[in-house]
Swiss-Prot record:
This is Methionine aminopeptidase 2-1. It is an enzyme of class 3 (hydrolase). Residues 69-81 have a biased composition (Basic residues). GO terms for cellular component: cytoplasm. Cotranslationally removes the N-terminal methionine from nascent proteins. The N-terminal methionine is often cleaved when the second residue in the primary sequence is small and uncharged (Met-Ala-, Cys, Gly, Pro, Ser, Thr, or Val). The lineage of its organism: Eukaryota, Fungi, Dikarya, Ascomycota, Pezizomycotina.
Length: 460
């Protein structure tokens, strides 16, 4: 989910360091980013032949005993192995069922550079610290890997249905229903969506819409066309640990270079991320890669521009945006990444002016926990705030989410909460009309001994 640059500026902040997210520090293992589970267990022995069937047949042969009576030997043929659970299409099998008694897959494990003296752990005290921390953060890592696997399985299905002719309402519903089914929390009962579910409303941004657009109840239906560029951005959380990842699809090959540029820029940001990595260096490197591409749109060459008004961001528990930012353009900032941080590394590339503005409409809302509720006096506002706190906390939510849990006649109360600053409202962000914007994003965990690109999959 894209983070707006503070105060509308085009560069990263020099703000204070964010609170450290809980560090996940299991020892590095081989990278294994899985997609949908495929196939079933095969009923074969190690050499691949079916010796067991022949043995069973022989064991069934009746033999005469010494007193002339017949004795039938027990058939020792093993029962066939049960088939491994498989995901459905659309995905509706809870992820805990698919991975019963098995660990969730790791993301892409990337070792830190061994030549970086700031990252080398050599002292006995440091090794003891790592050993203790390894035993303290299993839950953190398990939650993140579960959320990431849900994201992979849901987005793989979304890619099969995100085709010309589908409405954005249907696409958002399939994504969000899939997430809720796979985490095992429908979010209808009070507080259930805080256990696991959507990290924020599904973003479905077409053409010059860069970020923060989702279908709203009663709004005009939007249907995907062949010449559209569609960015799909959604988050999955388990116990408040949010995986934020996004990708872009296009059906006309003239947009291929745009998608390639943005994907390359995001991968550059991931490559340069790490403990003590400087935000200004990462930002400059991202822009250099992004803007080295050019795209031909209807016979006209256009440069790919990095959006200056959006940025990547760190993620805190139950808060999709922390107070650290990773811009996509050259910036001056003293911020660095730290051990234990969780970052959403994302980039947006545009054929427009490379800067967004607020459009009409509403994407969603979020609770501002730093603003006092003492000024909230309207009864409808108090009732709405209670529903928000009990069901969403500080997670962003949309009008659809409110209506889904049965909240009605909320508009007056919402206006009051926004006016008092207790709730923040997000508008869609757009570049110039006629331009095209693409986005790619991954979540990375900065563990002490490696970084784990937790949302990495076979698709991107």
């Amino acid at each position: 989910m894209g983070s707006k640059s503070p105060n509308g500026e085009d560069r990263g902040p020099n703000g204070p360091s964010a609170k450290k997210a809980v560090a996940s520090i299991n020892p590095p293992k081989s990278a294994a980013a899985s997609g949908l589970l495929r196939g079933a267990l095969e009923d074969q022995d190690e050499d691949g032949d079916d010796d067991e069937g022949k043995i069973g047949a022989d064991m069934n042969v009746s033999e005469k005993t010494a007193n002339g009576t017949k004795k039938r030997r027990r058939n020792n043929k093993k029962k066939k192995s049960a088939q491994a659970a498989q995901q459905t299409a659309p995905p509706r099998v809870e992820i805990a069922t698919l991975f019963h008694n098995r660990p969730y897959p790791e993301g892409e494990i990337v070792e830190y550079g061994i030549n970086d003296e700031n990252l080398v752990r050599t002292t006995d005290e440091e090794f003891r610290h790592l050993a203790v921390a390894n035993n303290m953060n299993d839950e953190f890592l398990r939650d993140y890997r579960k959320a990431a696997e849900v994201h992979r399985q849901v987005r793989q299905y979304a890619q099969t249905i995100a085709k010309p002719g589908i409405s954005m309402t249907e696409l958002a519903r399939e994504i969000e229903d899939g997430v809720r089914a796979l985490v095992g929390h429908q979010g209808i009962e009070t507080g259930d969506s805080l256990k696991a579910g959507m990290g924020f409303p599904t973003g479905l941004c077409i053409n010059n819409v860069a970020a923060h657009w989702t279908p709203n109840p009663g709004a005009r239906e939007v249907v995907l066309q062949h010449d559209d560029v569609l960015s799909i951005d959604f988050g999955v959380h388990v116990n408040g640990r949010i995986v934020d990842s996004a990708f872009t699809v296009a059906f006309n090959p003239m947009y291929d270079k745009l998608l390639t540029a943005v994907k390359a820029a995001t991968n550059t940001g991931l490559k340069e991320s790490g403990i003590d990595a400087r935000m200004d260096y990462i930002s400059e490197t991202i822009q250099e890669v992004m803007e080295s591409y050019e795209v031909m749109i209807n016979g006209k060459p256009l440069p790919v521009k990095a959006l200056s008004s959006l940025s990547g961001h760190n993620i805190l528990r139950y808060k999709i945006h922390g107070d650290k930012q990773v811009p996509f353009v050259k910036t001056r900032t003293s911020q660095r990444m730290e051990e234990g941080d969780v970052f959403a590394i994302e980039t947006f590339g545009s054929t427009g002016i490379g800067r967004t503005r607020d459009d009409v409409g509403v994407y969603g809302y979020s609770r501002n926990e730093n603003v006092s509720t003492a000024g909230v006096h309207l009864a409808s506002a108090k009732s709405l705030l209670k529903a928000i706190d009990e069901n969403f906390g500080t997670l962003p939510f949309s009008r659809n989410y409110l209506e889904r849990i049965g909240v009605k006649n909320y508009h007056l109360g919402m206006r009051s909460l926004i006016a008092s600053g207790v709730v923040e409202c997000y508008a869609p962000l757009v570049d110039t009309p006629g331009s095209y914007v693409a986005q790619f994003e991954h979540t990375v965990l900065l563990r002490p001994n490696c970084k784990e690109i937790i949302s990495r999959g076979d698709d991107y």
